[in-house]
Amino acid sequence: MTTMTASQVIGLLNLEPHPEGGWYRQSFADRPDSAGRPLSTAIYYLLEGGKRNAWHRVDATEIWHWYGGDPMRIETSHDGVHRIEALLGPDLMSGERPQFVIPASHWQRTSCLGDWSLIGCTVTPGFQFSRFELAEPGWEPG
C-alpha cells in the first residue's frame, strides 16, 4: 500500500471541513422515514495528527469504522460526568478495535494518534445537523 498524506486523502475523497473539526463527506443517505429523516447515513471522516474534535453529541446511534492511517482515540461520556476511552484501529493485539458503537445522546470526541486517521461513521437514524449539539468551548466531562 502506498503511504499517503492527509492532504492527498482529503483531495482524493473530496472531503470538506467539519464544524466539530476534521474533514468529512457524506457518502450515503438511506431512504427517508415518514418524517423525512434518512433511516441511516454514512460519512468519511479524517482527523489530522495533533488534533482532536470538539465534544459533541447527536440524537442517534453512531458506529465508527477504522479505514486507514493511524489509530484514533474515542472518548465518550453517557452522563457528562464519567468518561471512557476506546482505541479505533487495526492492532487488535494492543487493544485497538476496527469498530466502536456510540449510543444516542452520548457526549464524544476523538483524537488522532499519529499523522492522520481515516474512519467511517454510520448513523441510525440518519444524521441531521439540526440534531447535533456542540459543547461549549472548554467543556469536559466531570
Model segments located where?
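Non-catalytic, conserved peripheral segments adjacent to functional cores
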Residues: T2-V101, W107-T110, G114-S117, C121-G142
